[in-house]
Structures are given as C-alpha cells and as structure tokens.
C-alpha cells in the first residue's frame, strides 16, 4: 500500500492488481507458483523496517551530528529503520531539526530562521541516497 500512497496512485481493489503493478515495476518477482520474492530495490525503497531484510539492513540511512568541526565528539547518531522512500520525509525533517538556526523578533513574535533552505537538504539527501 505504501507504494501506491507515495505515488498517489489509486489502490487496486483486488490483490491481483497490486501484484501486477509491483511486478511491472520490478519491485517483486513472480515465481508463477503462488509465491513471490521481494527485490532488493523494492525492499530498500519501501520497507517499513529494513531489519526484516538481513541482506540490506546495513544500507539504512544514517545521520551523525558532530559537536563542532571535529569528528571526535558526536551529539547524535541515528540509524534509520525505514526504506528510503518510506522514511524520506522523516529523514529530511530530522536533518532540518539538527541544523543551526537564527532567531529574529518580528512584530513582537520570535521566529526561527533556518540557515539552509529545506529544498537544499532535500536535494542533498536524495542525491546521497541515490541507488
């Protein structure tokens, strides 16, 4: 269902339609005996939990935040568990929350201004996760 939600496709009313679509996109392989194999690309993109796939769980996204410019002290180290497509929005949000920001007061209201636009982070992460 995640595949259809992410691409904003209507979810097929029958299981056969779901399987046909996933096979046509090479996300699963049909063995024609009622069994299917999830392709690595399907798992790494759409897994709700990459730990369910031992051969690719080490490919999970990982974000390390260092204190200052040295790599000796880490502030946080987070290893993702979701597939790239499923967890992408959360990954962007997490990185944006870790970036430095300035505060300004405008009309008696305090506002936080990010030093790096979200579109830049989104593109950077998309390129870093390129398969």
Language model: regions and residue ranges:
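Active-site helix-to-loop segments that bind/position phosphate- or nucleotide-bearing substrates
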Residues: 1-131
């Amino acid at each position: 269902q995640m595949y259809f939600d992410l691409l904003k496709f209507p979810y097929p009313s029958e299981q056969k339609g779901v399987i046909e679509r996933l096979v046509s996109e090479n996300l699963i392989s049909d063995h024609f005996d009622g069994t299917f194999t999830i392709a690595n690309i399907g798992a790494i993109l759409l897994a709700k939990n990459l730990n369910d796939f031992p051969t690719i769980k080490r490919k999970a996204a990982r974000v390390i935040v260092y204190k200052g410019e040295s790599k000796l002290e880490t502030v946080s180290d987070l290893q993702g568990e979701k597939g790239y497509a499923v967890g992408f929005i959360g990954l962007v949000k997490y990185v944006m929350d870790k970036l430095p920001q300035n505060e300004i007061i405008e009309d008696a209201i305090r506002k936080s201004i990010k030093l790096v636009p979200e579109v830049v982070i989104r593109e950077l992460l998309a390129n870093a996760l390129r398969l």
